[in-house]
Every structure is written in C-alpha cells, then in structure tokens.
Amino acid sequence: MDFDAVLLLSFGGPEGPEQVRPFLENVTRGRGVPPERLDHVAEHYLHFGGVSPINGINRALIEQLRAAQDLPVYFGNRNWEPYVEDTVKVMRDNGIRRAAVFTTSAWSGYSSCTQYVEDIARARTAAGTGAPELVKLRPYFDHPLFVEMFAGAIADAAAKVPAGARLVFTAHSVPVAADERLGPRLYSRQVAYAARLVAAAAGYAEHDLVWQSRSGPPQVRWLEPDVADHLRALAESGTRAVIVCPIGFVADHIEVVWDLDEELRAQAESAGMLMARASTPNAQPRFARLAADLIDELRCGRTPARVTGPDPVPGCLASVNGAPCRPPHCAAQATG
C-alpha cells in the first residue's frame, strides 16, 4: 500500500487561558457534564498557565517523524486547533491522495480507537470531493519500541528511589460497561498485557495495575482500583517508595502532569512515601521510529512487529476512511 503523506491525529489541548473553557466544552459536548465540573477541571489547566503540554509535544514529535521517514507530515486534532477537519481540507487542496494516520493512543476502545475512526470519517465528509483516503494505523501497545521506551523510563525512575520500590502502572479509567462491550474487556486486557510485557522487560517480577482520572456520576462503575486508593493502601501496608508508570499515556497529558505529578505526588509526600514518575514517550526519536515502522508494515506488507508474552491480547487492524476496524471490536463498541 502506497502513501503520499502522514497525518498525526491527536486529542488537542488549549494553548492559553482564554482557550481552556471552550476546549473543555468541545471535549464534553453532549455528555451532560455540569458547568461546575468544567470549572474544576479548568483549574488544572490554569495551574499551567492555561497551556496543555500536548500540542507542543506533538509538534516536536512531528519533526522527529519527518526525520524518520520520507513522507510529509500533517497535524490534526479532535478537540482543538488545528482541527482535523481543517487539516484534511488542506491535504485535499495539496493533492494528497492517501495518507497513513498515526494516532497518539496505543489502544483499542471507544475513546482510544473508535472515536479517532469517527474523526477520520467526519473529516473526510467535511472535505468532500477529492478528500484523501485515510488509513488509520493499528494500535501499538505490543510494539517492541513501545515496550522498550516504557521499560527504559522505569529504569530511569528507579534510580531516583530506593531499591525495592513498588512498581505501579496506571492508565485512564473508563466505564466498566464500555470496557465490557469490547471482546470483552479488550481495553483493560490490552493495558494489563502491555504492563506485563514492560515489567518483564524492566526486570520486575511483580507489579500493580491501577486506573486514574475517572469522571462522571458516582453511580456509574468505572475500572478500579483507583490510583489514589491504591497508593493509600500501599502506604498503610508499609510501602515507602513507588515507581508510577503512566503506561496508558504516550505523552504528558494534563492527566499526567496534574493528576500524577501534582495530586498523587502530594498524596505520597503526605503519607511519607517517595514517588518517582516514569516518563512517557513524548517526542522521543524512538516514538517516531515506532510510527514509521507501523507505516512500513502497510507499505511493505510486513508482518506486524510485536512483543509476545503469555496470554496475548488481540488488537484492531488498520481502518480505512472511517470504516470499523478489524477484528470488529471497534464496530461492537460503536453499535453496542
């Protein structure tokens, strides 16, 4: 399969105080989130001057990706400028015929896969006649470079705390009902599998997997245990040092720099615990090489590069022009 461009498709984030509330309204539109909840979350962004780190990280990653392969790279977001609809129109006007779409999410699931597929379909519709074919690349939670980057980050974090620190992986929680529609529990199983692969690569025989940043009504069940509850339990059991690895995030979203670096670290300090947070891939050259390798899998018809371990978990395959991924996990999520 030939490509003449790459589209980096991401979540988006505000880049100034005046953009915070409109951005959050975009993210939560149609979900019935009360205004006071938006006000609360807005304070997290305003703590950093109203600037999410994600757009700057993605621009740096794009420069790395341009150096790692020979195709032009475009940038589009779901929830803030540059909006993917506008970017695809530019691609159309530039004569792009088929582009590989690399998303900043490693997983299957609605918000991590299906919603990006919907973004692609919506953007092509907005572009109309002459819109390029858009091929979303597969999830990459088991790619060798994904495992290598997080294993290396854990080693770096371990150097900052005493030997024997407890290794705790964390990822974004989702409603249990949403997770169970996929396979079942495809998202949570993928995260657990990737955590096992990374822990083994980093030389850890034991680790914990917890969830973070849940939202929504308290009566709705979300994936547990929550990271704050787990840290409290560790402290009560006598644990004095932890390494927190945000394996669910490939970049420093606000859920990383606020929920972990600010809130969780303060909780650890108040409990007398040392905490080291493993870095995310962000704009590492290896992350760009991972994206380039996914592109080459389709360009050259290569067998996907995967790290294998006990009880492997399936993932979606490439999706073309917003069609449901195969196997039909994302289709089940979209229609469930």
UniProtKB/Swiss-Prot annotation:
GO terms for biological process: heme biosynthetic process. CDD domains: Ferrochelatase_C, Ferrochelatase_N. Fe-coproporphyrin III binds at residues 52, 116. It is an enzyme of class 4 (lyase). Its EC number is 4.99.1.9. Pathway: Porphyrin-containing compound metabolism; protoheme biosynthesis. Keywords: Cytoplasm, Heme biosynthesis, Iron, Lyase, Metal-binding, Porphyrin biosynthesis. One of its GO terms (molecular function) is ferrochelatase activity. It comes from the Bacteria. One of its GO terms (cellular component) is cytoplasm. It holds the Pfam family Ferrochelatase. It is found in: Cytoplasm. InterPro entries: Ferrochelatase, Ferrochelatase_AS, Ferrochelatase_C, Ferrochelatase_N. Fe(2+) binds at residues 172, 255. Gene3D superfamilies: 3.40.50.1400. It catalyses: Fe-coproporphyrin III + 2 H(+) = coproporphyrin III + Fe(2+). Its main location: cytoplasm. The keyword Transit peptide does not apply. The keyword Cytoplasm applies. Involved in coproporphyrin-dependent heme b biosynthesis. Catalyzes the insertion of ferrous iron into coproporphyrin III to form Fe-coproporphyrin III. PANTHER family: FERROCHELATASE (PTHR11108), FERROCHELATASE, MITOCHONDRIAL (PTHR11108:SF1). Belongs to the ferrochelatase family. This is Coproporphyrin III ferrochelatase. It comes from Mycolicibacterium paratuberculosis (strain ATCC BAA-968 / K-10).
